[in-house]
Curated annotation (Swiss-Prot):
<dbReference type="GO" id="GO:0000028">
    <property type="term" value="P:ribosomal small subunit assembly"/>
</dbReference>
<dbReference type="GO" id="GO:0006412">
    <property type="term" value="P:translation"/>
</dbReference>
<dbReference type="GO" id="GO:0003735">
    <property type="term" value="F:structural constituent of ribosome"/>
</dbReference>
<keyword id="KW-0694">RNA-binding</keyword>
<keyword id="KW-0689">Ribosomal protein</keyword>
<dbReference type="GO" id="GO:0019843">
    <property type="term" value="F:rRNA binding"/>
</dbReference>
<dbReference type="Pfam" id="PF00203">
    <property type="entry name" value="Ribosomal_S19"/>
</dbReference>
<keyword id="KW-0687">Ribonucleoprotein</keyword>
<dbReference type="InterPro" id="IPR005732">
    <property type="entry name" value="Ribosomal_uS19_bac-type"/>
</dbReference>
<dbReference type="InterPro" id="IPR002222">
    <property type="entry name" value="Ribosomal_uS19"/>
</dbReference>
<dbReference type="InterPro" id="IPR020934">
    <property type="entry name" value="Ribosomal_uS19_CS"/>
</dbReference>
<comment type="similarity">
    <text>Belongs to the universal ribosomal protein uS19 family.</text>
</comment>
<protein>
    <recommendedName>
        <fullName>Small ribosomal subunit protein uS19</fullName>
    </recommendedName>
</protein>
<comment type="function">
    <text>Protein S19 forms a complex with S13 that binds strongly to the 16S ribosomal RNA.</text>
</comment>
<dbReference type="GO" id="GO:0015935">
    <property type="term" value="C:small ribosomal subunit"/>
</dbReference>
<dbReference type="InterPro" id="IPR023575">
    <property type="entry name" value="Ribosomal_uS19_SF"/>
</dbReference>
<dbReference type="GO" id="GO:0005737">
    <property type="term" value="C:cytoplasm"/>
</dbReference>
Length: 93
């Protein structure tokens, strides 16, 4: 279920402070964050955020198309190795 419009988007305060400081100083260093639940807002456009996926930090460069999505959507937590196929299919009988 989507968040109510009257509440506005959720962004962790510590992340928003880092974003505003980075914009103010025009610093190009990536911002490291564990806040996968925060919504991407227009203030973040052009920044690189390192989002934690549980094991490592995944760099996410924010563009206009990312606005409105959550940060966690761009840092997958699981790696899909594929289903085990039969040997006949792999050989190409």
């Amino acid at each position: 279920m989507a968040r109510s419009i009257k509440k506005g988007p959720f962004i962790d305060d510590h992340l928003m402070k880092k974003v505003l400081k980075s914009k103010e100083t025009k610093d190009n260093k990536p911002i490291k964050t564990w806040s996968r639940r925060s919504t991407i807002v227009p203030d973040m456009i052009g920044l690189t955020l390192n989002v934690h996926n549980g094991r490592a930090f995944v760099p996410v460069y924010v563009t206009e198309n990312h606005v409105g999505y959550k940060l966690g959507e761009f840092a997958p937590t699981r790696t899909f190795k594929g289903h085990k196929g039969s040997v006949q299919k792999k050989i190409g009988k």
